[in-house]
Regions:
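N-terminal leader/capping segments at the start of a protein or of a new domain
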Residues: 1-42
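Conserved double-stranded beta-helix
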Residues: 148, 154-186
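Short acidic-glycine-tyrosine-enriched beta hairpin
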Residues: 108-140, 182
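Ligand-binding loop in jelly-roll beta-barrel domains
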Residues: 135-154
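Conserved short histidine dyad/triad with adjacent acidic residue
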Residues: 73-87, 136-138
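A short glycine-rich, His/Asp/Glu-containing loop-to-beta-strand
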Residues: 50-79, 131
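Short, conserved beta-strand element in jelly-roll/cupin
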Residues: 76-78, 87-103, 156-159
Length: 186
């Protein structure tokens, strides 16, 4: 059994592969993955250093592992970076490697004509080591780095978000299409 100091990205990917073969429920997958991601983010040395920084002028977004049933990415949020309310179309688990991030969860009620009522369900400031779970039906959130330093996270999703058609909402509830950019390293 790997300890926190020895639990590596390769260990994590192996565990994810096993879990996603054993489980079909998004809730069960995220319940089992969350403590493992918490262990991984406590050992940032296991993530290649080039995937833990943002390029000048943009958010860092790197693929660490791509598999048929899951993807592992690193995301580097610059100070002040914000993602408005958006969905994922899959389960997800997010862990903070360094610094902190503010996550706002929303309940969305479609009102028609490309609009929705967004109700804030919770606002949580996640410190280093914290893990957040997303499951369909409870996977609309916004993210914000309120600090003066980069925030580094590991994101795990049940689908590849690059090119996936999703939705985002402005603060006034206007719905807009969202297609995630490609990763910076592929």
């Amino acid at each position: 059994m790997a300890t926190t100091e020895t639990y590596t990205l390769n260990d994590f990917v192996g565990d994810l592969d096993r879990i996603t073969r054993e489980e079909t429920s998004a809730t069960r997958v995220t319940e089992r993955v969350a403590p493992l991601l918490a262990q991984l983010v406590r050992n940032p040395r296991s993530i290649p250093a080039e995937y833990l920084r943002s390029p000048a002028g943009q958010r860092g977004r790197y693929i660490l592992h791509r598999a048929p049933k899951f993807n592992v990415t690193s995301v580097v949020w610059r100070p002040g970076d914000r993602a408005t309310a958006h969905n994922h179309e899959t389960w997800g688990v997010i862990g903070v490697v360094e610094n902190e991030i503010e996550e706002t969860r929303y309940r969305v009620t479609e009102t028609g004509a490309g609009r929705a009522k967004l109700e804030v369900a919770s606002v949580t400031r996640h410190p280093t080591g914290a893990v957040s779970r997303l499951v369909p039906g409870d996977e609309v959130h916004g993210m914000y780095n309120p600090t003066s330093r980069d925030t580094i996270e590991i994101h795990v999703y049940g689908r590849d978000l690059a090119g996936l058609k999703r939705r985002r909402w402005d603060d006034d509830g206007t719905e807009k299409p969202l297609v995630s950019d490609k990763y910076l390293n592929c």
